[in-house]
Amino acid sequence: VPTDIPLVKSFYEQGLPVWGEVELAYRTGKGRVLAITGTNGKTTTTALLGKIMSDAEDSVFVVGNIGTPYTSKALEMKDSSTTVAEISSFQLETIEEFAPKVSAILNITEDHLNRHHTMEEYIRVKELIVKNQTAEDYCILNYEDEVLREFGRHIVPKTVYFSSVRKLDEGIYLDGDLIVLKTADEEIPLVH
């Protein structure tokens, strides 16, 4: 539901809460949340991460814009659960307390301007994914996206950049067919 329709605007004007599906599910569910957004690649990344996590843990839920509503699984979640959630800009508009342990913004390119009206507003809404994250949380950002590279310099959660085209001083990058994690102290091959 667009947040600028008269009914929703009147709720905001009256100080009434306006929760979307993601906010309701987050408040109802348990466990840690890994949330993925971006203009392109969300579904593929969410499915891949969901598979990796499902192979490593017992209680994993892959939900959100990927097709399974977050709310449909929220009551099944336990403290030990991991939720991998694909989150769209539309879903981010109505978050209030939603706070993923790890967030990722894959990229931001011009899209949904019929809803967000300007590129600046679209970027602002995408960046809401870190709104409630703390310094104990992580945000994974695409180093090749100039908007995200700059955004990462000014956010509360720990920033981890990734790149498929260059070696990074710190972050995750491709080196030939090798995925490498480089920290200040070491270089760790992750997948070959």
Which role does the model predict for each range below?
Residues 50-55, 72-76, 153:
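Short, well-ordered alpha-helices that flank and scaffold nucleotide-derived cofactor binding pockets
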Residues 18, 33-34, 58-60, 157-159:
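Hydrophobic anchor at the start of a short beta-strand
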Residues 32-38, 46-47:
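ATP phosphate-binding P-loop of adenylate-forming
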Residues 58-70:
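Short beta-strand-centered segment that lines the nucleotide-binding/catalytic pocket of NTP-utilizing
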Residues 77-161, 165-168, 172-175, 180-181, ...:
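Flexible active-site lid/hinge loop adjacent to a nucleotide/diphosphate
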Residues 44-61:
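A conserved segment at the C-terminal end of the G1
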Residues 1-35:
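Short, basic phosphate-binding NTP loop
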